[in-house]
Each structure stands twice: as structure tokens, then as C-alpha cells.
Regions:
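Conserved phosphate-binding/catalytic region of the ribokinase-like
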Residues: 1-6, 15, 31, 154-158, ...
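Glycine-rich phosphate/adenosyl-contacting loop at the front of the ribokinase-like
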Residues: 1-61, 68-72, 79, 243, ...
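Residues at the starts of beta-strands that form the adenosine-phosphate
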Residues: 4, 57-59, 83, 161-164, ...
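Active-site flanking residues adjacent to catalytic metal/cofactor-binding acidic residues
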Residues: 8-9, 165, 193, 223
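Residues that scaffold the ATP/ADP-binding catalytic core of kinase and kinase-like folds
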Residues: 15-16, 110, 131, 201, ...
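Conserved N-terminal subdomain of the carbohydrate kinase-like
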Residues: 23, 28-31, 38, 53-135, ...
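Structural alpha-helical scaffold elements that stabilize or flank donor/cofactor-binding regions
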Residues: 125-126, 183-184, 214
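Conserved beta-alpha-beta core of the PfkB/ribokinase-like small-molecule kinase fold
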Residues: 132-211, 228-230
Length: 254
């Protein structure tokens, strides 16, 4: 069964360098041979793309520049069937992130937000028929996008559409007051986050306690655990753990 969903969030061109060693062992100030590739990326763009691959009707809400990076991103969306409209900001440059991927598949990222800043209520599509909304945390964590994103959330909630929120990385969250971020959580129906983010938001290293703390604000919480799978829980329900599918890790960028 497919759903109709739109994703709000960051759109990036990923420049991925597969390095032969861990980042702290690189030859700084010298050369290190790598394998480099480029892909569409950004948390919002990644989720939109994979939802489309799974056969859902997906619309992307975000911003890119009128440059070659932006053209590459929209071309990838077109090939996957992701709907997009009015993404291009004239005169702006698209967001780009340089990603170092070590032999274990772990990533280290250097993002340049570019055109992603400045989302506003006018970027929101007509809400008729949508079943769900995915919101990347990178958007409200951007000060120039926060007012517009809050307006979007208000309109979406009034329309009765559930919002699934992924708060982004701890590094990004540390640039915003923690209490400010916590105040947003009550606005969402479901919280999707990893272990590090759950611990940061709650101060609880015990995942059951972290789930219960987060469920004071959200109806449902899912904590992603990498190679250990995921654990989720509804408010007043029992937690459910799902193991990860065995696979060779190549790149955890998304």
C-alpha cells in the first residue's frame, strides 16, 4: 500500500570521498588517494528519494540554487519520480556537503547549507490528499528557516496530517539552545532519531528511559541503533525492538 507524503528539508549535493583510513590518520597538508563520487543528498532529499523508491507518491519541499549542483539534484528526483516545484532560488548556490567515508562506512561531513536557508510558508504545497509529512531537523535548526517552518507546522497540524520529525545530528542541535529544541517536540506525532540524539535530548543513556521521556511530548518514538536495528514505542505501549538486516556496510551517508 502506497501513501502520499511530502518531505520538508535540506537538499544537498553530496561529494563523497571514500578514504582508505580513518579521518584522524589522513596525511594533512599532503595527498591521500581516494575514490570520489557525487550524489543527491540532504536528509530531506534522501528520505524523499527512498520513499519514492518504495513506490510512494512523494513531493519535496526545499530549496536549491540555479547552478549545476541544483540541476543534478532535480535530475535525480526526476529519475526517481519525486515531485518538486519551485525549488530553485534564482542567484543562489545549492547546498553542498563534502563527506569522508572511512573503511567501516562511517561518515564525517563538512556541509555548506547554501540555498537551503530561508524556507517560508509560501513553499508549502496544497495539502489535499497527503497522508504524512516528514520534517528534517536541519530546517528548523537553521535560524533563517525556523519562523517559516513553524508556520508550516501550524498549517499542517490544523489540516490533521501527522508529522514525522527527525531532529538531525547532535552537532547541529548543539548550535541551538537545548530547551528551544525540546519545546518543538510537542508539535510532532512521531520522533525519529538515533541513540546519540536520544541521549542528548533526554540525558538518559538507558533507551527505555529515553523513550519514556520523549513520549511525554510525542505519541510515538523510534530510536535508530545502526547495526543493532531500532527500538520503538507508542505512548502507554510496550517497546518493540527490530534487528538490523545483515549487510556489508559501504556508506552510512544515506
Amino acid at each position: 500500500m502506497s501513501i502520499k507524503v511530502f518531505c520538508i528539508g535540506d537538499l544537498m549535493l553530496d561529494v563523497v570521498a571514500q578514504i582508505p583510513t580513518s579521518p584522524h590518520e589522513l596525511h594533512l597538508g599532503n595527498d591521500t588517494r581516494t575514490i570520489i563520487s557525487t550524489h543527491g543528498g540532504g536528509a530531506g532529499g534522501n528520505v524523499a528519494s527512498w520513499l519514492a523508491v518504495l513506490g510512494n507518491e512523494v513531493t519535496m519541499v526545499g530549496r536549491i540554487g540555479d547552478d549545476s549542483a541544483g540541476s543534478a539534484i532535480t535530475a535525480e528526483f526526476d529519475s526517481l519520480g519525486v515531485r518538486h516545484k519551485n525549488l530553485v532560488i534564482p542567484g543562489a548556490r545549492s547546498g553542498v556537503v563534502v563527506v569522508l567515508v572511512d573503511p567501516t562506512g562511517e561518515r564525517t561531513m563538512f556541509p555548506d547549507n547554501g540555498a537551503n536557508s530561508g524556507l517560508h510558508i509560501g513553499d508549502l504545497p496544497n495539502l489535499d490528499g497527503f497522508n504524512a509529512v516528514y520534517l528534517s531537523g536541519y530546517s528548523p535548526l537553521d535560524p533563517s528557516s525556523l519562523p517559516g517552518v513553524k508556520e508550516m507546522i501550524s498549517v499542517i497540524r490544523n489540516a490533521g496530517i501527522p508529522i514525522y520529525f527527525d531532529p538531525a545530528s547532535v552537532g547541529a542541535m548543539k548550535e541551538v539552545d537545548l530547551q528551544e529544541i525540546k519545546s518543538w517536540l510537542q508539535l510532532f506525532d512521531c520522533l525519529l532519531l538515533n541513540e546519540e540524539e536520544a541521549i542528548y535530548l533526554t540525558g538518559e543513556s538507558d533507551l527505555e528511559k529515553a523513550l519514556d521521556a520523549l513520549l511525554l511530548d510525542c505519541t510515538m518514538v523510534v530510536i535508530k541503533r545502526g547495526s543493532l536495528g531500532a527500538i520503538g514505542k507508542y505512548r502507554h505501549g510496550q517497546s518493540i525492538s527490530v534487528p538490523a538486516i545483515a549487510a556489508e556496510v559501504v556508506d552510512t551517508t544515506g
